[in-house]
Swiss-Prot record:
GO BP terms in the entry: glucan biosynthetic process
GO molecular function annotation: hexosyltransferase activity
Family per record: Belongs to the glycosyltransferase 2 family. OpgH subfamily.
Protein name: Glucans biosynthesis glucosyltransferase H
Group of enzyme by EC: transferase
A GO CC term attached to the entry: plasma membrane
PANTHER family membership: CELLULOSE SYNTHASE CATALYTIC SUBUNIT A [UDP-FORMING], GLUCANS BIOSYNTHESIS GLUCOSYLTRANSFERASE H
Amino acid sequence: MDGTVTPSPITTAMPPVSALDAGTPTLPPEAPLAMPEQNLREGSLQVRHQRTSPPGIGVRRFYLIGGTFATTAIAVWVMLSVLWPDGISVLEGCLLGLFVLLFAWIAMSFASAVAGFVTVVARAGRKLGIDPEQPLPTLRSRTALLMPTYNEDPRRLLAGLQAIYESVAETGQLEHFDFFVLSDTTREHIGRAEELVYNALCDRVGGHGRIFYRRRADNAARKAGNVADWVRRFGGSYPQMLILDADSVMTGDTIVRLVAGMENNPDVGLIQTLPAVVNGQTLFARMQQFGGRVYGPIIAFGVAWWHGAESNYWGHNAIIRTQAFADHAGLPSLRGRKPFGGHVLSHDFVEAALMRRGGWAMHMVPYLQGSYEEGPPTLTDLLIRDRRWCQGNLQHAKVVGAKGLHWISRMHMLIGIGHYFTAPMWGLLMLIGIGIPLAGGDIDLAGDLPFSPARYWHGSSQGNAIWIFVCTMFVLLAPKLLGYIALLLNPRELRACGGAFRAAVSILLETVLAALMAPVVMYLQSRGVFEVLAGKDSGWDAQVRDDGKLSWPALLRSYGGLTVFGLFMGAVAYAVSPALAAWMGPVIVGMALSIPVVALTSLRRTGMALRRAGIFCIPEELDPPKVLVRASELRRAAALEPSLI
């Protein structure tokens, strides 16, 4: 582990196949690292203040928490003026409690987004000596690029890896890197196809002895176990490992700068990039990637600003110090039965928290471009993945109290847990807001029709309820507005997003579509929370990478019940009062139209038609980097080959 460079071994004879491997692996000599399981009931924080923490990090965090508290306090004071005059009933007390929690949630996001906006506009936030505008540094150590895969199309997978390999080679520093395809594939025919495509890739690029492949015989602990198996067997040869996802693409320039950042900061354990979502073709994928490109930096720069050296890990497109990971990130199996017990699902948060406990700095560098991923093509695919994340995040309830964690690491987990509980909380807030005037005894449905909760609240509070609604919407939508302003201040990015008018139309359309889909997401996230609490496991399936191609029967199965429920709620509301139905309209319409909305946003032709009109454009489409062009070329060529799976 001295960091010196040695050539990658070029094997002339196949090493003995380990009992850990299935199929025919191609691997270098083993260089084991011990990776003990960590004890969550014992331990202490090794380094309280990191050398690489930005100046004034305490002030930054005081701003975030103090700003959240102050903004929430003002909103609660106004809400009390709505509820207090006639005393607070039980329902009103429940409403107030939910309001405090939910407004604090969006107020914290707002405070973070404001910090992110200032950082983006000021072009600040660079750290660790990583400057993309400086000449490419010369490396001194070896790094392994790890690409885990699970039942993926091997041709598509390795097309992306080939593009990365070629981009690294163009930096002139390929000798510092080895590449590993780490398969957890369980379908034997896909495993055989992986070996064929891997060998063809090595022949094509001359990668024998530098690109390696293995498939685990037992894929215990999923992706976390996959990476841990590699660390325990081969980690001793590589001071750093860069973790990719099956759809990840990164430029060689960015990879080299990440490695140099690790070499120049020996107390840093992890550097996380901000992957830009690209290659979307369906309407849903394109609106997601546009939102990520315009609002994403505001959010990412904001959290990086107050995370400091206690940043989080997102599981891919990040570089990790191998020894630090081995020493501190061995995950224990949680006590109890699934879904809360067993292997840690959302392993990345926990690994980052344990590494920080062990004394290593964790950083995010959102300004470093050249890191890419693909998003799910449809809302259905997003919600399937989200259900797994829901279980993984709620499982953190068993980890958040672990001994010795930094309080920011605990905050990461609490935010992850809270993200899923906000869905049922918003639903309850809406229902209680309707129920209070109906249950209060002051409404004579026979004499006071048409009944409207909005009219009731407005009349009982001299208009303060309207101000509460307006302020809530402003705080909720502020990141979009700030993202647009930042875009206007960057002429190059603005042109690449279609110009000021088209970008504004894109933001408006994205907001409308997101609002239509919000009730669907709220309902299904709420159902996911209750399923996890009831003990239902999410399972582990391969992700859809290309067009969603949802059939009408599949849409009916997924959203038919929600559509009927929305129509029923609309009919009941209309029977009480047309004004009540109008007030509930956004939620009712979103549920009732869930099937056509999901169908429309899942269409490739709709997304591509909007692209031709300049809507939802991103810079990577106007002027795509070479690595993305190459990956697309290779994937198109792979799609023309006879299917292997």
